[in-house]
């Protein structure tokens, strides 16, 4: 199992630089973060964040992280893909992957904040169908010399993109919401099974281990039904060290290992204690669980 950590919501670039270098030195395999472009003041934030928490723009931050680190995988969790034109997102992702030496794992999701979507000209009711067309378009732009798309939401007439990435950039999808306890709805499971390289579990689901195990089996069954090999489909579970007693960290990692998940993301997004406190807690986590990680 490959284990990574989240970048806390530090606003200062010096703090970001110190944290990501420290996390890389601790041996984490991947570094994740999420985004919002704008915050809707009238929308309740169900995840404990506030509209004035600092959210960095994903691709700008990825460029900074690519220049700051040397080894760790850069993992968006998630890029709200419908907020961007497919061609622009394809170009940005290709550039980041090229400039980072092939270290991008692109996590995408449809988003939930309707005020944010409307501010960027996106119809919330079509965001799922839009994301599907975006993903297929982006892969075509990364792969093909000339691309034509005649979709409902994306239309291209004989365009090409250079430079193209030197590999197929993995695209993972999120799914689930607070109303369902993080369990992904059936349309989302079907979309992931058809189009994604992996599933990034929504954090609340990681607190209900039985529900998480059932959801994993459901996703794997859908991947199999789509004619794909579930063993080649990645699954990233979550663990929040600040919400799980320290004496239970090892047992929680053992649980995810037994379920056969490919990745684990260690969530610490608030970063209220500062860089040193966050890295100290992560160091304790590494010392307790490192023997269960996949070796590079």
Spans of model-derived segments:
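Active-site-adjacent structural elements that line small-molecule/cofactor binding pockets in enzymes
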Residues: 1-296
């Amino acid at each position: 199992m490959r284990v990574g950590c989240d970048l806390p919501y530090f606003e200062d670039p010096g703090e970001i630089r110190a944290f990501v270098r420290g996390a890389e030195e601790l041996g984490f395999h991947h570094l994740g973060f999420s985004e919002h472009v704008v915050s809707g003041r009238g929308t309740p934030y169900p995840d404990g964040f506030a509209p004035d928490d600092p959210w960095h723009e994903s691709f700008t931050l990825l460029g900074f992280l690519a220049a700051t680190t040397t080894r760790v995988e850069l993992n968006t969790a998630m890029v709200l893909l419908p907020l961007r034109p497919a061609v622009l997102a394809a170009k940005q992702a290709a550039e980041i992957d090229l400039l980072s030496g092939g270290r991008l794992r692109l996590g995408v999701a449809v988003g939930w904040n309707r005020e944010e979507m409307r501010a960027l000209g996106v119809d919330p009711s079509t965001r799922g169908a839009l994301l599907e067309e975006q993903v297929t378009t982006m892969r075509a732009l990364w792969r093909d010399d000339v691309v034509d798309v005649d979709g409902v939401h994306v239309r291209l007439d004989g365009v090409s993109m250079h430079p193209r990435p030197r590999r197929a950039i993995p695209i993972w999808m999120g799914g689930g919401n607070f109303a369902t306890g993080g369990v992904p709805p059936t349309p989302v499971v079907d979309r992931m099974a058809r189009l994604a390289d992996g599933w990034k579990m929504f954090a609340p689901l990681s607190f209900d281990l039985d529900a998480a195990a059932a959801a994993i089996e459901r996703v794997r069954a859908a991947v199999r039904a789509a004619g794909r090999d579930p063993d080649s489909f990645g699954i990233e579970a979550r663990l929040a060290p600040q919400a799980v007693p320290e004496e239970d960290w090892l047992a929680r990692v053992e649980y995810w290992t037994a379920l056969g998940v490919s990745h684990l993301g260690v969530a610490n997004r608030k970063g209220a204690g500062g860089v040193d406190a966050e890295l100290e807690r992560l160091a304790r986590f590494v010392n307790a669980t490192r023997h269960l990680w996949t070796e590079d």
